[in-house]
Structures are given as structure tokens and as C-alpha cells.
UniProtKB/Swiss-Prot annotation:
Belongs to the RNA polymerase alpha chain family. NCBIfam families: PRK05182.1-2, PRK05182.2-2, PRK05182.2-5, rpoA. This is DNA-directed RNA polymerase subunit alpha. GO terms for biological process: DNA-templated transcription. Homodimer. The RNAP catalytic core consists of 2 alpha, 1 beta, 1 beta' and 1 omega subunit. When a sigma factor is associated with the core the holoenzyme is formed, which can initiate transcription.
Length: 329
């Protein structure tokens, strides 16, 4: 009995692309494969590509994030929020993970000023305001940069040995700002039930959308190769190995138990969730979008904010969190 062949695209069509935006088409695909491929690529693109981000800061005379700095209008918490948004592109092979920035006699500190103190990185959003400085004051700050994937909370960016005055911060490494996909019907000869997948990728400029798509596809290919006949093996699992604590399980459990009060939510979004008795990230992740739209004073702006939060944390709405035993201490 012969094996029926699948209808597959001969190539990927790049409709348009620049350093920040790419639009790609895959056609024709068998029915159902548009969503299957589109969703897999979207999740990998958002969570698994590498990038650079600030993971910690050190300011002379500052011991914690709730401090204020003489001659600087913003407090340290606001400065950290702004630094989390700075996007970097590595342009040199120099291994530089510390940047000391010194702002002297200028009214503001913008992201572009960081480039004056490093030759290893390009700042992709130079006009981003970090803080306002009294023109008669000086402002010095040491930035720690690291390479990583996805998102890491400040707790996981703490150095192995405690450093006096060092403040770890949340790091958003992913170079992908957004990914959208849609599936349309397409014709092959007389049949009109084949599918066309349209994939739209928005990056921060540190990676070209075409390279991002290739990188995500290669990650999937490497994982799927594990299921090929040549590499698939079955080994008996020892009882003691079954009792080994799963680090990923513990990480996810800790993340889901994070209090919403500890996250950088807007006042409106936080109050809407608080009124609905939603207190933790895990409780938020179990909700469906339709559930949230029923909340009092909850609108599209709050929904967009929470959708981005869920993406940044590599979660999804409608999650089944029962297996993480969040009710247990």
C-alpha cells in the first residue's frame, strides 16, 4: 500500500521585510497544518531566541531599588523600569558585560548615552529616556549585561556571591516584540480547501525577521529529530530517578505563585484583578479572555497589558495549573 504524499509549499515567500518587520507566506498546506505550524513557530519565536538585556545595576550610594538619588528627578524604581526597555545589539566580539555610564552636566540620561561608554553594543532605541538629571549634578551607574532567552525575573539574576549595592532587575532577553499569524484558504487546481499560513514577525532590530524565523525553525527541527527512528530509544527509569525533583516544575510553581502586587501592573489593571479576587499570576493564567472582559472597568488597554505580561512570562491564558499544586506550601 503506497503512502499518500502531503501537499507542502515548495518555498517560503517573504512578502516584505526590513530590520524590524517581516511578513511571510507558506502555501499550500494540508487542512489543519496552518494552525499547527503557525502556533509552534509563534511560541518558539516569542520564548526561545537569544538576546541581550540589563540584568543588574550598581549606583554609588544606593543600596536598594526604593532609594532616591540626589540631583535625579526619578527614583531608582522608575530608572529600573526604563532600563528594562533598553534594547541592545552585539556589534563586536569583545566580551563586555559591564558598562560604566557617567552623565555629567546634561539635563537627561537617554539610552543612546550608553553607547558612548561601550564599543561592543549598539543601542536600538537611543531616544528612550532613562532619567532627568540636574544639570549641576553628576550621575554614575554601572550596568551588567548578559545574554539569555525569554524572560528572567530579578530573583534569578542575583549573583552567586552577594555584592554590596548590586540591584538585580527583571531581564527581557527576547528580541521579538510580537508575532501574529493567520490562516486562509487557498486553491490548488480544483481544490479550495488547502491552507495558506501568513506569519508576521516584529523584532527590536537586533535580529532580522528572516533570521529569527530560520532560528525558530531550526530549534523545532532539532527537537523533532529526537523522535526520528535513528535517535528514539526507550530506557527503563529507575525509581530513584522518578523521585528526583524537577527543576522546571519548581520554577513554574514559584512563578505561578508570584503575587500580582509584586509585578509592574498599571493601577487600573491591578485594581480590576484585585476586585475580582485575582491575587497571583497563577490565578490570572487560568482565566480566559472572555472571563476578564466581564470584570468591572476592564477594557482593551488592560487586556493588552495582561496579554503582554502573560507572553513575557512564557505562560498562556486558560492554563491548567492543577499539576503545580499551588495550594500547597
Amino acid at each position: 500500500m503506497s503512502i499518500l504524499s502531503f501537499q507542502m509549499p515548495e518555498k517560503v515567500v517573504m512578502e516584505k521585510a526590513d530590520d524590524f518587520h517581516g511578513l511571510f507566506e507558506f502555501k499550500p498546506l494540508e487542512k489543519g497544518y496552518g494552525v499547527t505550524i503557525g502556533n509552534a513557530l509563534r511560541r518558539i519565536l516569542l520564548s526561545s531566541l537569544e538576546g541581550y538585556a540589563i540584568t543588574g545595576i550598581k549606583v554609588p550610594g544606593v543600596l536598594h531599588e526604593f532609594s532616591t538619588i540626589p540631583g535625579v528627578r526619578e527614583d531608582v524604581t522608575e530608572i529600573i523600569l526604563n532600563l528594562k526597555q533598553v534594547r541592545f545589539k552585539k556589534i563586536s566580539d569583545v566580551n563586555e558585560n559591564k558598562i560604566v555610564v557617567s552623565i555629567k552636566k546634561q539635563a537627561s540620561f537617554k539610552a543612546g548615552d550608553i553607547a558612548k561608554f561601550t564599543s561592543a553594543y549598539q543601542i536600538l532605541n537611543p531616544e528612550l529616556l532613562i532619567c532627568n538629571v540636574d544639570s549641576n549634578s553628576n550621575f554614575d551607574i554601572e550596568l551588567t549585561l548578559e545574554k539569555g532567552r525569554g524572560y528572567l525575573p530579578a530573583e534569578e539574576n542575583k549573583p552567586a556571591e552577594q555584592i554590596f549595592g548590586y540591584i538585580p532587575i527583571d531581564a527581557i532577553f527576547t528580541p521579538i516584540k510580537n508575532v501574529k499569524y493567520s490562516v486562509e484558504n487557498t486553491r490548488v487546481e480544483q481544490r479550495t480547501d488547502y491552507e495558506k499560513l501568513i506569519l508576521e514577525i516584529l523584532t527590536d532590530g537586533s535580529i532580522h525577521p528572516e533570521d529569527a524565523l530560520k532560528g525558530a525553525a531550526n530549534i523545532l527541527i532539532k527537537h523533532f529529530m529526537l523522535f526520528s527512528d535513528q535517535t528514539m530509544t526507550f530506557e527503563a527509569v529507575k525509581a530513584e530517578e522518578e523521585e528526583t525533583v524537577d527543576e522546571e516544575f519548581l520554577h513554574m510553581r514559584k512563578l505561578l505563585k508570584t503575587s500580582l502586587a509584586d509585578l509592574d501592573l498599571s493601577v487600573r489593571a491591578y485594581n480590576c484583578l484585585k476586585a475580582a479576587d485575582i491575587k497571583t499570576l497563577g490565578e490570572l493564567a487560568t482565566l480566559d479572555i472572555s472571563d476578564m472582559m466581564k470584570f468591572r472597568n476592564f477594557g482593551k488597554k488592560s487586556l493588552n497589558e495582561l496579554e503582554q505580561l502573560i507572553i513575557d512570562k512564557n505562560l498562556s491564558f486558560g492554563m491548567d495549573t492543577a499539576k503545580y499544586k499551588l495550594d500547597e506550601d
